[in-house]
Curated annotation (Swiss-Prot):
This is Large ribosomal subunit protein uL29. It comes from Bacillus subtilis (strain 168). The lineage of its organism: Bacteria, Bacillati, Bacillota, Bacilli, Bacillales. Belongs to the universal ribosomal protein uL29 family. One of its GO terms (biological process) is translation. Transmembrane segments: none annotated.
Length: 66
């Protein structure tokens, strides 16, 4: 999901997606530890997506304080 697509969502929707991505990241790390993970690049993709969403949330917080 691109940053522009994330900006179209409400803050509550973004927070919900962050929560689900964190759960997915936990599961991916668990699979990695047990040797079941085939696509290791997915961990990086999920981490980057979480960072993008948190960045948009922070941008909104800063804009609201001005």
């Amino acid at each position: 999901m691109k940053a522009n697509e994330i900006r179209d969502l409400t803050t509550a929707e973004i927070e919900q997606k962050v929560k689900s991505l964190k759960e997915e990241l936990f599961n991916l790390r668990f699979q990695l530890a047990t040797g079941q993970l085939e696509n290791t690049a997915r961990i990086r993709e999920v981490r980057k997506a979480i960072a993008r969403m948190k960045t948009v949330i922070r941008e909104r917080e800063i804009a609201a304080n001005k």
